[in-house]
């Protein structure tokens, strides 16, 4: 490989290297803000280090959490049940999700349009997690593994404006 080719490869590699080492956008946000668990198993600890004991082990990928504080690579989080503790930032994603809330057996409906009289197209039990793509006028568009519909904003946790 000649010198001109190696310079060309180096110039292509530098932006890729810079992108790979860049800090995620989520790490730059100021709390409070929303995030979601991004691993099949995530530990909530009593403090911001692996030296602190584990309080909870979450096995719900995409579960929404509220970020309350930051300390280096650690985030103080609150889960849908109100439990607070610390998680490493690599366990979290900036993808905004929500969990359906309500009493056991209380089904929430997803509608075709953001209106109380719109056609019911899906039903979701409390605990179902989906991705939020928009929230307006008391309704959020929720995507649960490709099944999309509008759900009343008070029927989910993980959507309210923060700050």
What residue spans do the PLM features occupy?
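Bacterial N-terminal signal peptides
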Residues: 11-21
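Second-shell loop/turn segments in exported
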Residues: 49-52
């Amino acid at each position: 490989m000649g010198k001109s080719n190696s310079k060309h490869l180096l110039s292509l590699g530098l932006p890729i290297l810079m992108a790979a080492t860049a800090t995620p956008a989520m790490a730059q946000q100021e709390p409070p803000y929303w995030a979601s668990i991004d691993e099949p198993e995530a530990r909530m600890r009593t403090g911001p280090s692996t030296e602190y004991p584990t309080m909870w082990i979450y096995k719900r990928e995409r579960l929404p959490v509220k970020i309350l504080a930051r300390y280096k690579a650690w985030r103080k989080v609150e889960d849908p049940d109100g439990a607070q503790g610390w998680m490493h930032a690599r366990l979290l994603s900036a993808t905004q999700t929500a969990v359906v809330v309500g009493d056991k057996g209380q089904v929430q409906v997803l509608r075709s349009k953001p209106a109380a009289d719109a056609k019911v197209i899906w039903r979701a039990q409390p605990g179902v997690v989906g991705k939020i793509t928009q929230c307006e006028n008391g309704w959020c568009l929720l995507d649960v593994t490709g099944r999309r519909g509008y759900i009343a904003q008070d029927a989910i946790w993980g959507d309210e404006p923060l700050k």
